[in-house]
C-alpha cells in the first residue's frame, strides 16, 4: 500500500442487526460531506453482503474519491492491512469496528440500540470518538437484534450526519 499526501478514511456502514445500522441515506450524507471537505482524500468502503455491495457500488460511482475496498481486495487479510493504514474508520457497532481497533486504527463508532457501556467498545478506543444520542430506552438490546419498541430506531435516525462528520474532522485535523 502506498499513501502519499492524502488522508485515508474508512467507512463501514453496515452491521448484522437493524438496531445497529445507521440509515443508508444519512450515511451517504456523511460520505458526501467528507468527500466535499477532503476532495484529495481516499474513502474506502467496507461491507460484504449482496445488498451492501449494491449500496457501496452506487457510492463508488457518485463520489470520485470512494473505493469499495471489500470488493477490490477480496479477502479479510487484505482488508486488515488496508485498515491498518487508515487515518480514521467510521463504523457502526460491528465487526469492522473491532477489526479496525485491533489493527490500531482510530474509530468513530456509531451506536443505536446498543450502548458502549455494555462493554463492546472497540479495543483501545475512546468514548470521545463515540457518536450516539442519549435516550432513556437505550440500550434496548445488547446485541442490536431486538425490534425497536418505539418504532423506527430514533436512537439512530436522530443522529445527524454532521455530528459524525464533525467527529471525523476532529481526528483528521489534529
Residue ranges and their predicted role:
Residues 1, 78-79, 98, 118-120:
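Short, flexible, glycine/charge-rich loop motifs used to bind or transfer phosphoryl groups or to couple energy/partner
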Residues 1-9:
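Nucleotide-sugar donor-binding and catalytic loop/hinge architecture
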Residues 10-15:
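Short beta-strands and strand-loop turn motifs
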Residues 24-113:
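Donor-binding and catalytic core of enzymes assembling or modifying cell-surface/extracellular glycoconjugates
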Amino acid at each position: 500500500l502506498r499513501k502519499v499526501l492524502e488522508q485515508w478514511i474508512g467507512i463501514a456502514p453496515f452491521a448484522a442487526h437493524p438496531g445497529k445500522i445507521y440509515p443508508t441515506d444519512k450515511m451517504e450524507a456523511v460520505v458526501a460531506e467528507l468527500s466535499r471537505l477532503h476532495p484529495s482524500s481516499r474513502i474506502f468502503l467496507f461491507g460484504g453482503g449482496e445488498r451492501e455491495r449494491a449500496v457501496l457500488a452506487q457510492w463508488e460511482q457518485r463520489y470520485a474519491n470512494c473505493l469499495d475496498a471489500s470488493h477490490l481486495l477480496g479477502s479479510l487479510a487484505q482488508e486488515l492491512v488496508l485498515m491498518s493504514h487508515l487515518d480514521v474508520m467510521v463504523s457502526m457497532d460491528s465487526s469492522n469496528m473491532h477489526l479496525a481497533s485491533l489493527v490500531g486504527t482510530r474509530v468513530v463508532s456509531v451506536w443505536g440500540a446498543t450502548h458502549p457501556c455494555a462493554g463492546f467498545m472497540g479495543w483501545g478506543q475512546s468514548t470521545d470518538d463515540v457518536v450516539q444520542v442519549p435516550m432513556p430506552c437505550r440500550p434496548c438490546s445488547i446485541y442490536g437484534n431486538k425490534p425497536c419498541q418505539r418504532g423506527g430506531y430514533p436512537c439512530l435516525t436522530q443522529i445527524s450526519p454532521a455530528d459524525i462528520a464533525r467527529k471525523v474532522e476532529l481526528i483528521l485535523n489534529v
